C-alpha cells in the first residue's frame, strides 16, 4: 500500500516517448474531475487526454437522448478509432468509467498497453447478469432515497437519468475530500444517463476475439469507498483477476482526497508494463 502523500515528478529518458494516459470519468462527473492528476502528469512530462463522455462535462448532448451504452461511450471510441495504429495508450477509468475501459479493451486491444480501474466496475462482459449488477453497480439503498431521477421517456418508462441528491454527496462521494472539491463538484456534476449505463452488455469484437486478455489490467482498490464498496471491488477482482492490485486509503474520489498517492500508483502501474 502506498504510504506517503507526496508530490512526485519524473525525468523521462530522452530516448523514450512519454506514455499517453487517457482518463475516463465516472457517473455524473466529467474530464474536469481529473484536473489534479492531469497537472501532476503534465509537469512530469507525460501526455494526458481527459475525455468527456456524452452528456458529461462540457459535452452538449442531452442526457435524455442517450438510450444505449455505445451512444454514451462514443467519445472514447472516436478517440481510439482515430489514434495511430502504431501507438498505444494507458487507459484509466474511475467508477462507472470501468465499463468504458472494458468496452475499449474489447474493441481496440492492440492500441491499449494497460488498463487501470480505480474503484471501478471491472466486469468482463459488462452488466449481463444479476451477479454483475450486484458486484458492479453501487447499492446505496441503505441510505434511503439518494437519487434524483429523470424520466425523459415519460413516467411510465424506466428513468433516463440519475444523480445523487446534493445532501448525500459529501457523505457518500467525498467524505475524505477537501471542502473546496465538494464545492467544485456541486457546480459541475450533471445527471448521468442511467438508462444507457444499464444497457452496458459488452461483447468482444469478432475480429478481436481472445485479444482482450492480452491487455494487462491493474485494479486500484479504494479502501474507504462508500459507493463502490470494498466487498464489491473484491468480488470483481476474484471473478476477473487483474495483473496487479494496489490499495489506496481514499473515499470514492481519490483524485480529490488522495491525488498524490493516486498519481504515484498510476506511475507504478505504467512502470510495471515497461511504459516508463
Swiss-Prot record:
- Name one molecular function that GO assigns to this entry: methyl indole-3-acetate esterase activity
Could you tell me the Gene Ontology terms of the biological process aspect for this record? indoleacetic acid conjugate metabolic process; shoot system development
- Enzyme class name: hydrolase
Q: Which UniProt keywords apply?
A: Hydrolase
Named in its record, the pathway it takes part in is: Plant hormone biosynthesis
Instruction: Explain the consequences of disrupting this gene.
Output: Longer hypocotyls when grown in presence of exogenous MeIAA.
Tissue specificity is: Expressed in several tissues of seedlings and adult plants, with a higher relative level of expression in the seedling shoot apex and the adult stem.
Matching InterPro entries, A to Z?
AB_hydrolase_1, AB_hydrolase_fold, MES/HNL
Catalytically driven reaction(s)? methyl (indol-3-yl)acetate + H2O = (indol-3-yl)acetate + methanol + H(+)
Q: Does the keyword Chloroplast apply?
A: no
PANTHER family for the chain: METHYLESTERASE 17, METHYLESTERASE FAMILY MEMBER
Can you tell me which family this protein belongs to? Belongs to the AB hydrolase superfamily. Methylesterase family.
Please describe what this protein does.
Answer: Methylesterase that efficiently and specifically hydrolyzes methyl indole-3-acetic acid (MeIAA) to IAA (auxin). MeIAA is believed to be an inactive form of auxin that needs to be demethylated to exert a biological effect.
Q: What name does UniProt use for this protein?
A: Methylesterase 17
Q: Organism, per UniProt? A: Arabidopsis thaliana (Mouse-ear cress)
Which lineage do the record's taxonomy fields give for this organism? Answer: Eukaryota, Viridiplantae, Streptophyta, Embryophyta, Tracheophyta
Q: Which gene encodes it?
A: MES17
Amino acid at each position: 500500500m502506498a504510504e506517503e502523500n507526496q508530490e512526485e515528478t519524473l525525468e523521462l529518458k530522452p530516448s523514450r516517448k512519454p506514455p499517453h494516459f487517457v482518463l475516463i470519468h465516472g457517473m455524473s462527473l466529467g474530464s474536469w474531475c481529473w484536473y489534479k492528476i492531469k497537472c501532476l502528469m503534465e509537469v512530469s512530462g507525460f501526455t494526458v487526454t481527459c475525455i468527456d463522455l456524452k452528456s458529461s462535462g462540457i459535452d452538449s448532448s442531452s442526457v435524455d437522448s442517450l438510450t444505449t451504452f455505445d451512444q454514451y461511450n462514443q467519445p472514447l471510441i472516436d478517440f481510439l478509432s482515430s489514434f495511430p495504429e502504431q501507438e498505444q495508450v494507458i487507459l484509466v477509468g474511475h467508477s462507472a468509467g470501468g465499463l468504458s475501459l472494458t468496452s475499449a479493451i474489447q474493441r481496440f486491444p492492440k492500441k491499449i498497453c494497460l488498463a487501470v480501474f480505480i474503484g471501478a466496475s471491472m466486469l468482463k462482459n459488462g452488466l449481463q447478469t444479476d451477479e454483475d449488477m450486484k458486484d458492479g453497480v453501487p447499492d446505496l439503498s441503505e441510505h434511503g432515497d439518494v437519487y434524483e431521477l429523470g424520466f425523459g421517456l415519460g413516467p411510465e418508462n424506466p428513468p433516463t437519468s440519475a444523480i445523487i441528491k446534493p445532501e448525500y454527496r459529501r457523505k457518500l462521494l467525498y467524505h475524505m475530500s477537501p471542502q473546496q472539491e465538494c464545492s467544485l463538484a456541486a457546480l459541475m456534476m450533471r445527471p448521468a444517463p442511467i438508462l444507457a449505463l444499464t444497457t452496458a452488455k459488452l461483447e468482444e469484437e469478432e475480429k478481436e476475439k481472445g485479444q482482450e486478455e492480452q491487455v494487462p489490467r491493474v485494479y486500484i482498490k479504494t479502501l474507504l469507498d462508500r459507493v463502490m464498496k470494498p466487498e464489491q471491488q473484491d468480488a470483481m477482482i476474484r471473478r476477473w483477476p487483474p495483473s496487479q492490485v494496489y490499495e489506496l486509503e481514499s473515499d470514492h474520489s481519490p483524485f480529490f482526497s488522495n491525488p498524490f498517492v493516486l498519481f504515484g500508483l498510476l506511475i507504478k502501474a505504467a512502470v510495471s508494463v515497461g511504459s516508463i
